Amino acid sequence: MKENSVGLVKTKYVTFKDDFYFESGRILSPITVAYETYGKLNEKKDNAILICHALTGSAHAAGYNSPDDQKPGWWDDMIGPGKAFDTDKYFIICSNFLGSCYGTTGPASIDPSTGKPYGLKFPVFTVKDMVKLQKKLIDYLGIEKLLCVAGGSMGGMQALEWAVTFPEKTYSIIPIATAGRITPMAIAFNTIGRFAIMKDPNWMNGDYYGKTFPRDGLAIARMAGHITYMSDKSFHKKFGRRYATFGGIYDFFGYFEVENYLRYNGYKFTERFDANSYLYIIKAMDIFDLSYGYGSYEEAIGRIEADSLFITFTSDFLFPSYQTEEIVNIMKNHGKNPEWVNIESDYGHDAFLLEFDTQTSCIKEFLSKIYNKVANQ
């Protein structure tokens, strides 16, 4: 195990049996939520931080679920003793969001009324629905107000949604490499993924459970996604124009190293993720827009009362920095004083999973300031 790891952790589950109302008007029950916690909740219950994961993440953000695990949780370098989210000081919560396939109820879960997986009978959900379910978990844990909600990419969308929908429930937010709505280009890449899965003959209109999995479609969808997670510079550094086979450029089935990378990661992804969950989640990403229900984007962002630290990366292709700059400017126009750090990086969108040192310094300083402010109230 790595040094300064939170060590062995157990994924916990809670099932809410009351009706859950989706933004679409659909109702579902029961709903199970998978979550993990790190650190200790203090007596005042004012040191709790909610970490929100990205598109294909899970509740397992730090530590190890088993002594045999080869890798720790997906943000282990950021969560633990002395790290950005210091477990000696804060109580960290990470839950698998609604519709995913890592323990929280989603399309692959069993519909109790039929005894079969929901498939496409599962309601279309939104980022706001994810946040509403997270709030049920926070209420269940007896936490009145979160010290902070933080996350990268789609996790940052959830942090923003928390601040807009439940402004009274968090003292601060740290949205990283994210936006209040995605660009048409991002929707276009998601469309490729959607088309690839739905055109796979094994998808069978979402009714593939217990049958042949739509592996090719999901692998291609992941390949398209991977392109947006990197940058031109990171592609050059990692692969250049190197050829991966010995047949030479005139071998019809020869391929470049970058092709090999996309193919390998695409198919590896199919071993751990559900195709229907992927379709539902990218749908939630596409339709996410903070302005919905508030008249305008400016009005929605004006609802944010939480102290805010925004982090972006100069080479982010999927969520360009100008999207955060727009939010920051709107907040300033509403008399707020958000902090914004634009980190120089060649890693592209994936920088939030790789640029640990630069993120850690500004996050630790920001959280310490918020913690002291709350403690002195």
UniProtKB/Swiss-Prot annotation:
- Report residues binding substrate: 222, 350
Tell me the GO molecular function terms. Answer: homoserine O-acetyltransferase activity
- May I have one GO cellular component term? cytoplasm
The record's section on SUPFAM superfamilies has: alpha/beta-Hydrolases
Which GO biological process entries does UniProt record here? homoserine metabolic process; methionine biosynthetic process
Q: What is its EC number?
A: 2.3.1.31
This protein's pathway: Amino-acid biosynthesis; L-methionine biosynthesis via de novo pathway; O-acetyl-L-homoserine from L-homoserine: step 1/1
Q: Which reaction does it catalyse?
A: L-homoserine + acetyl-CoA = O-acetyl-L-homoserine + CoA
Enzyme active site: 153, 316, 349
Localisation: Cytoplasm
Location (main, coarse): cytoplasm
Which InterPro entries does the record associate with it?
A: AB_hydrolase_1 (IPR000073), AB_hydrolase_fold (IPR029058), HAT_MetX-like (IPR008220)
Tell me the ranges covered by the AB hydrolase-1 domain, including all copies. Answer: 47-355
Q: Sorted alphabetically, which keywords does the UniProt record give?
A: Acyltransferase, Amino-acid biosynthesis, Cytoplasm, Methionine biosynthesis, Transferase
- Answer whether the UniProt record assigns the keyword Amino-acid biosynthesis to this protein: yes
Assembly state and interactors? Homodimer.
Q: Which PANTHER family does the entry mention?
A: HOMOSERINE O-ACETYLTRANSFERASE (PTHR32268:SF11)
Describe the function of this protein.
Transfers an acetyl group from acetyl-CoA to L-homoserine, forming acetyl-L-homoserine.
Family (UniProt): Belongs to the AB hydrolase superfamily. MetX family.
Q: What is this protein called?
A: Homoserine O-acetyltransferase
